[in-house]
Amino acid sequence: MPQYQAVKGTRDIFPEEAARWKYVEGVVHAIASLYGFSEIRTPVFEYTELFQRGIGSTTDIVGKEMFSFLPDPKGRSLTLRPEMTAGVMRAALQNNLLSSAPVQKLYYIGELFRKERPQAGRQRQFSQFGAELLGVSSPAAVAEVITLMMQLFASLGLRSLKLRINSLGDTEDRLRYREALQLYFTPFHELLDDASKERLEKNPLRILDTKNPALQELVAGAPRLYDYLKDASLQDFEKVLFYLEERDIAYEIDYRLVRGLDYYCNTAFEVTSSELGAQDAIGGGGRYDGLARELGSSVDVPASGFAVGMERLLITMEKQGLFATLAPQGPLVYVIVQQQDLADNALQIVWRLRKAGIKTEVDLAARSMKAQMREANKIKAAYALFIGTTEETTGLYALKNLETSEQITLTLEAVLELLREQAVGEQLD
């Protein structure tokens, strides 16, 4: 066994899989741009208190899962980001983005870190993409980010996804509901696990998010938050549902859905895939009007957003066979060196081909012509260009189509022109 191994909870991504990541990222960039969202990139670590205030001190993320350390000269704890939304809001507030443009539409693709038990689709270092719509307080804004997310899934060809949605109401609604939950769960205090007992005092809504099988029946009998919503909250939620129906986006109201972060209010949603087993969430989000004030803003910044786990998305796509046609694309041409004393000349031709925008490969290991041809076919090159004494003497080069075996003889300039046209055609495809 090699002396050094990847750290538990991390993994290497090799070229074939990296091509899948690149494909998904390309679709994310395209659909986000279609909706008028611009990319933002924030630091991978922030002051720990940003997440304590933003995510919520009673959440599992803050209580158990953050990678925190103390290298700051002033003794302030730093944390590798466990989620993106708090950092995006911090960036918007710190840089006064909303004063120059009262509505900000931002999206991201980034690495995150949590101390979770490693399993399929859940690593300690993982990736998410998502979008945040800042500065708009309306059902239309929530519907906008949901529609963006669902169109993105559709563009990737995903099937059989379920959109679950609920209203968490406003602060007053949740305070009334909090009291109702405490009244309901307190008589069952001895049946609760340690985490739920702690949540009962600090934030009983978190009990509804428990994954403990022994508590599922008890949770199922709990009061519904929906029954504690005021008329304004109900109307807000119904308007979101109206927009989804107008756009033919199927949904299921899940009265137990609370999400795992404390900053959500009003609409919350989650998308699940049956391909992922018990841990079936592929992404989700909601509205978070109070986050800016939690981070020290003197004014409210209404906001809505979503995040999708890349690893879980890729697992779902793999299980649905969506990568079957995404074979790695080989070079357009493989330069075959027939005599090694011409290797330097061949490298000069390779440089000219690449400079012209033609994807070109060449053997750098001085292997036999037979081995070079075997490699050209293995990596699915479209053409082989032969460099030998005859070609150097006459200035005419043999170009072989490796799919049809048809071979033609051309000047180097004609080869460049032919392959350049092919390369442009591939880019247009």
UniProtKB/Swiss-Prot annotation:
Quaternary organization: Homodimer.
UniProt record similarity statement: Belongs to the class-II aminoacyl-tRNA synthetase family.
Enzymatic reactions: tRNA(His) + L-histidine + ATP = L-histidyl-tRNA(His) + AMP + diphosphate + H(+)
CDD domains: HisRS-like_core (cd00773), HisRS_anticodon (cd00859)
EC numbers: 6.1.1.21
Gene Ontology MF annotations: ATP binding; histidine-tRNA ligase activity
PROSITE patterns in the cross-refs: AA_TRNA_LIGASE_II
Keywords: Aminoacyl-tRNA synthetase, ATP-binding, Cytoplasm, Ligase, Nucleotide-binding, Protein biosynthesis
GO CC terms of this entry: cytoplasm
GO BP annotations listed: histidyl-tRNA aminoacylation
Location in or out of the cell: Cytoplasm
InterPro entries with a match to the protein in the record: aa-tRNA-synth_II, aa-tRNA-synth_II/BPL/LPL, Anticodon-bd, Anticodon-bd_dom_sf, His-tRNA-ligase, HisRS-like_core, HisRS/HisZ, HisRS_anticodon
NCBIfam families, A to Z: hisS
Name of the protein this chain belongs to: Histidine--tRNA ligase
Source superkingdom: Bacteria
